[in-house]
Amino acid sequence: MFVDETGAATNMARRHGRRLRGHRLRCGVPHGHYKAITFVCGLRLRGVVAPKAYDRAMTAAMFEAWLERHLLPTLEEGDIVVLDNLQAHKSPRVAEILATKNCTVQYLPPYSPDFNPIEKAYSKLKAFLRKLAERTVPGLIAILESCADLFRQTECENFFAACGYDTT
């Protein structure tokens, strides 16, 4: 299981489009003020688990609370949880929380998004968010927290395979 955070904002919109030759493409693009959202979830071969969005930056305390309330119930005995090197992940309490289910923690090498299949899932998620172009914080949070249905099992297996992991 891979765990990571990403950001989303109320100003996300498509930057490119198509139109018939000779016709100008016009669409509204937000400028000025926007609100940023932090999104965290886990990725398994079977799909996305424990999606949660926060309207502020991730802290160690928030990450620990998310682990206990949202991720821990989805973990199976002996799972390996792979984290990146965000400072919030390095808290000693993280290993304690995961040890309650006999799970071990592995950290990715620094600056190695190519080894993290959840980055590919986040790429698809952000394209989906740009398509929807949600402008309100509650609407964006609702979309993010219901995103688990967006990812099929075969697609998640492909994310893992693209990063060089065996999916059998």
Protein language model regions, located:
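Short functional hotspots at interaction and active-site rims
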Residues: 1-168
